[in-house]
Swiss-Prot record:
Belongs to the glycosyl hydrolase 22 family. Type-I lysozyme subfamily. Expressed in the epithelia of the basophil cells in the digestive tubules, but not in the epithelial cells lining the digestive ducts and stomach. Expressed at a much lower level in the style sac-midgut tissues. No expression detected in mantle, gills, labial palps or hemocytes. This is Lysozyme 2. Disulfide bonds join C24-C100, C29-C35, C40-C49, C62-C82, C72-C78, C96-C114. The keyword Disulfide bond applies. The lineage of its organism: Eukaryota, Metazoa, Spiralia, Lophotrochozoa, Mollusca.
Amino acid sequence: MNFLILFCVVASASVVYSSISDQCLRCICEVESGCRAIGCHWDVYSNSCGYFQIKQGYWTDCGSPGHSMESCADNYNCASGCVRSYMDHYIKYNGCADTCESYARMHNGGPNGCKSSHHHATDNYWRLVQAKGCS
């Protein structure tokens, strides 16, 4: 009986989520900046910076890598690592599919952006990502 309970606990804890694919990450980068280090600009109440147009809250949620949000956002390795950390953190908590569409909608619409109840806010963004060759 104890073995059965332990097996059930271990089995239910072993759900595995993969990380955002390199191709999907590249499509998001292309949409956000043409995949270039473009510095920061004011965008809807706050600065958006770098390759992925990362905002302060996003950078904090991804673990605040690098020396500052601005320097991380303009360094492709740091910025892509931040995006991966953000996605890895939120995909397992929001019940969304492990797909490029979910990741793109989360990047644009926040942690809940991939939920169907929020799709209306991220539909245009998802179409832009698809136009870069991702599905």
